[in-house]
């Protein structure tokens, strides 16, 4: 179990949120590995759009889940100081992306 996964489990027990980034980078890797794109430029554009729209959607989904939970339980909102490690991808998926650089940049 990686550090980011442990942080995600702790956060899910405390606040109801979930660490999406392990699953998000897994989806990116699978999309790059399974799909065969006709040109490098098209691959670059698709990855760029997917990363930003997917990242925004997952952040919005996680925020709404926390907001609904706190409002339904009528808990006073307390500002949470988020550390960089809370939303940083695990070392496993960083290693996967580093070793798949040939597929990303089409060398």
Curated annotation (Swiss-Prot):
Its main location: membrane. Signal peptide: none annotated. It comes from the Eukaryota. The keyword Heme does not apply. GO terms for cellular component: membrane. It is found in: Membrane. The chain crosses the membrane at residues 15-35, 43-63, 87-107. It is a multi-pass membrane protein. Disruption phenotype: Confers sensitivity to the synthetic tripeptide arsenical 4-(N-(S-glutathionylacetyl)amino) phenylarsenoxide (GSAO). Keywords: Membrane, Transmembrane, Transmembrane helix. Partially overlaps RPE1. Disruption phenotypes caused by deletion of this gene may also be a result of a defect in its overlapping gene. This is Putative uncharacterized protein YJL120W. It comes from Saccharomyces cerevisiae (strain ATCC 204508 / S288c) (Baker's yeast). The lineage of its organism: Eukaryota, Fungi, Dikarya, Ascomycota, Saccharomycotina.
């Amino acid at each position: 179990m990686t550090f980011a996964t442990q942080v995600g489990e702790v956060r899910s027990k405390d606040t109801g949120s979930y660490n999406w980034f392990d699953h998000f980078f897994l989806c990116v890797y699978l999309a790059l590995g399974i799909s065969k794109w006709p040109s490098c430029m098209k691959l670059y554009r698709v990855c760029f759009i997917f990363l930003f729209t997917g990242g925004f959607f997952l952040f919005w989904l996680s925020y709404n889940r926390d907001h609904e939970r706190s409002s339904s339980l009528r808990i006073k909102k307390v500002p949470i100081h988020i550390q960089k490690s809370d939303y940083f991808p695990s070392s496993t998926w960083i290693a996967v992306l580093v070793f798949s650089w040939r597929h990303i940049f089409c060398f």
